[in-house]
């Protein structure tokens, strides 16, 4: 049973996100979504808000980014009655993969997807928990494109607007939807 999104406000989700100062390093204000996931009421609200947005958009598959994108994406795929594809950190998938690297503050990382995960022409929704610089989301979008998928939208719970990730994603040609926007994760 879906909870109608108007039954609770999106602001209620924002209130449920825990803020932790100086984690994982000094100067960062970490936004922890686990309280949303731990609450049946708020987790349902989160998923239902996304279901209502995408239920009429003819999604073929939901892809989720490692790791919290798995939780949200799998629940959303289930409700939309479509398959789920994990996009994992490099070296975590057992079958043949396609890889895409992205820049970190100090260095580089990569994500991978199975080569048979997205069929050419499939309409794909990419999901993660948040958008900061956009590097991971951009890498995921590129993987979907490499396999011939059509990006319906990239979606997240939270976007840190001052870090320009959303702007970078939109500049890549992908639409982006976030439930919440915040000025940033830098403590100051």
Curated annotation (Swiss-Prot):
EC numbers: 2.4.2.7
InterPro entries, alphabetized: Ade_phspho_trans, PRibTrfase_dom, PRTase-like, UPRTase/APRTase
Localization in the cell: Cytoplasm
Keywords: Cytoplasm, Glycosyltransferase, Purine salvage, Transferase
Name of the top EC class for this enzyme: transferase
Pathway field: Purine metabolism; AMP biosynthesis via salvage pathway; AMP from adenine: step 1/1
Family annotation (SUPFAM superfamilies): PRTase-like (SSF53271)
Protein name, entry field: Adenine phosphoribosyltransferase
Organism this protein belongs to: Neisseria gonorrhoeae (strain ATCC 700825 / FA 1090)
């Amino acid at each position: 049973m879906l909870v109608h999104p108007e039954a609770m406000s999106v602001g209620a989700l924002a209130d449920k996100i825990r803020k932790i100062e100086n984690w994982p390093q000094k100067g960062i204000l970490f936004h922890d979504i686990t309280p949303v996931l731990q609450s049946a009421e708020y987790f349902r609200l989160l998923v239902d808000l996304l279901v209502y947005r995408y239920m009429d958009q003819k999604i073929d598959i939901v892809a989720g980014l490692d790791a919290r994108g798995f939780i949200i994406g799998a629940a959303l795929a289930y409700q939309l009655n479509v398959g789920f594809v994990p996009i994992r950190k490099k070296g975590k998938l057992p079958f043949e993969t396609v890889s895409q690297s992205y820049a970190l503050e100090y260095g580089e990382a990569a994500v991978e997807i199975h080569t048979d995960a997205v069929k050419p022409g499939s309409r794909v929704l990419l999901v993660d928990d948040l958008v900061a610089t956009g590097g991971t989301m951009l890498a995921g979008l590129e993987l979907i494109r490499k396999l011939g998928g059509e990006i319906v939208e990239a979606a997240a719970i939270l976007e840190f607007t001052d870090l320009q990730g959303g702007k970078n994603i939109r500049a890549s040609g992908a639409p982006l939807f976030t439930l919440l926007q915040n000025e940033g994760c830098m403590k100051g």
